[in-house]
Amino acid sequence: MSLRKIAHYFLVFFLGCFASQATHLKGGEITVKRISDKTLTYEFTLTTYTENNRANQDQGDVNFCFGDGTAIFKAKRCCGSPVDIGNGTMKNIYKIEYTYPAPALFYRVSVAIPNRNDGVRNITRSVEVPFYVETTFSINSGLGQNSTPLLLNPAVDLTAVIGQPFIHNPSAVDAEGDSLAYRLSVSKSGDYETCSSASRGLVAPNFRQPNEVATVPSSFTINSLNGDLIWNAPQEVGLYNCAFIIEEWRNGVKISETVRDMQIEVKDVDNKAPKITVPPDVCVQAGTFLSETILASDVLSKSGRLDPITIYSFGNVYAMDTVYAVKQPYATFSSSPKQTSPAVGVFKWQTACQHIRKETYDIFFKVEDNPPVNVGGGVKLVDSKIWKLRIIAPTVKGLKATIKSSTASALLTWNSYACALPNAKIIIFRKQAACNPVVNKICQTGMILTGFT
């Protein structure tokens, strides 16, 4: 064998090895949590969603950059091996702690990994473009031990079918009850061997939104209020990449941005996504017992097939071993797997005073079908909905007014208040006019625009 042939085979073998090591990432995001009230020490968690292959097994660590001018810090994959979460997807978690030297308006923590999947249609030569995610967050004394939003719905239901709307929702929750908003972003890249700001956070080469690739028009949007990412509807088979941002707001000030970068695979198979129905958004007084039924049904495929379906639910109203969970009592959701249509799930929650807050609880429900493997490789499709639930303080009970003519005054008395929480206030309004009862709307607190002061 000639030296030229040996060199050729070696080159092919080398490139093949590189490709096997460089193609496995589907999506991911970085979560930040302050873990000390005395120092600026934070815990950083990178969650990635990957193919179930050797490249994923070999990704035992990643490089973090913390945005303060320091060098790379290496974080090990925690909790042992990757976790199989279905649909050919593995979940990987990398954790590291870091202490910042001083407060700042914003720090940008980022991770770049040289393993983006090959053949992504809206990124040129995607296999050569590092996977990249970042989270920016503010450090100041007024924020306390703040955490950035946690994304409960994994990037696993990422298969779309030509001609059908695709939906994904991250089911983001916030530990402190801050307001969340959503917007589209662009997929980015970065040098995984340096923390230089000049070489990180760059727009991926020739990136276009997924709906801008095919000649047939379609829309690709995200609902700024509930996080529904909808592609209506994919037109061409292939891999596509996208990214969106979850903004965290407190008292009208933005305090963090979390990026989820993820892949959508469009296929042409004989399957129709199921449909899910949730109750109307609701507002209740603390102490109300909630019991609601969630319904879902599969949709006939082209060949007239109905598949078994499973309903899932995520939210911080359920028991979780993290700071993101609400205080007890927790909500419960029960639903049998792989039901025939219509499928049923039951949500129950005994609300209490400690659940009162300004922002809604966004409870995520998802239905997934389970087609046979011999139909398009068993491609599972989903539908999802967000149910918004707000809990307000209960009304005062037993209110009585005793008129004192001698002093032209009234003595107000009421029963012991049910939700006498720390820093809670009962505000008394008065009005010098004829007495006409005012009936507040179900979720209105106070006496807005009624003439009372």
Model-derived features with residue positions:
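Extracellular acidic, Ser/Thr/Pro-rich low-complexity tracts
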Residues: T48-N52, S171-D178, I294-D307, C353, ...
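Recognizes extended acidic, P/S/T-rich segments that occur
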Residues: I85, P337-T340, K425-T453
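Short, solvent-exposed loop/turn segments at the edges of extracellular beta-sandwich modules
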Residues: R116-V120, E247-I255, V367-K380
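Extracellular interdomain linker/stem segments of modular secreted and single-pass surface proteins
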Residues: E265-A273, K385, R390-G398
